[in-house]
Amino acid sequence: MKAVVYDSAKNFTVREIPTPEPKEGEVLIKIELAGICGTDLHIHEGNFLAEFPLIPGHEMVGIISSVGKGVTDFKSGDRVTVNPVVSCGDCEFCREGSPILCHNRKGLGTNWPGSFAEYMIATQDLVFKVGNLTPEQAVFAEPAACAMHGIETLGMKPGSSALVFGAGPTGQILAQLIAKSGASHVTVAASTKFKLDVAKNLGADAIYVMDRSNVKKSFEDLKAMRPEGYDYVIEATGNMAIAEICVPLTRSGGTMMVYGVGETTDTFPINAFDVFHREITIKGSFAEIDTFPSTIAALQSGRIKTDGLISHRFKLEEYGKALETLRSDKTAHKVVITF
């Protein structure tokens, strides 16, 4: 089979390798679509827990080609997606019922072979049928599951206001889920107008076009739009200059959530007294672990919409071009690999 194989950070080729055979409890999946996201850019650089050699890719949909011994819930021909996060089940956090915080967490496409290949192996406990979802819908299962975990972490109260920084695919899905969780008003702020137009079409109450070279003005404008602040402010860009203005934009008693993926060394300043006397809560939301069933149900019901999110399609052999498009093309939204 053909696969993207990294021998080290930044050093990859698309080459022929043996097609794996499913072992007991495993399924072999023929990939139909695989999504590229910002995490893959970090992995390309050797960050985000990447271990080489590696086949990257953690967003996918495909058809089961064959199953190993002991697999009873799946058969050849089933369209499925895969939860790429694997917890050990034995560390302190797993035993406490918090596997998302697992000390020994593994990830398909991070330190296990992922989906930028014609075929991939997954253990049956990580595999989910997608029913009547199209490949173009089902490929969003993983980013949507991350957004679903973010909503659970946020713990939103109905009637609240929210500000989402970032209109990438997960920012778009977060905004939808926030609105459907009973928010009275959702504002999405981003630097790309066409992405904000998509956000508006998908249900955002207000949009704001940011100038990332003048974050101070963006802060002033967003503060003027809601002088008392926003009950929930979600940073979904990974940009530390934007993260810095989140707490000041949070309403007293409100919550700021760090959701965007930055570099492992990134920091941003916080006024401790402001957090203290206004009783601001700061939360983080990382990946997902158990939200695939609810996410697939939300995609099937139309509660999560993905219309207009896929902007670019590339063949596996064009993986390098796909990465560069996501990194530098301002018209890129969701970039997918087709097979």
What kind of region is each of these model predictions?
Residues D221, E244-P248, I289-F339:
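C-terminal hydrophobic helical "lid"/dimerization subdomain
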Residues K200, D205, M240-R303, T338-F339:
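Glycine-rich phosphate-binding loop and adjacent beta-alpha segment
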Residues C88-F165:
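NAD(P)H dinucleotide-binding glycine-rich loop of Rossmann-like/cofactor-binding domains
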Residues P18-A34, N47-E92, L126, G131-L133:
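Glycine-rich beta-strand-centered segment in the early N-terminal region that forms part
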Residues A3-E21, G38-S66, T81-V82, P99-P113:
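N-terminal glycine-rich cofactor-binding segment
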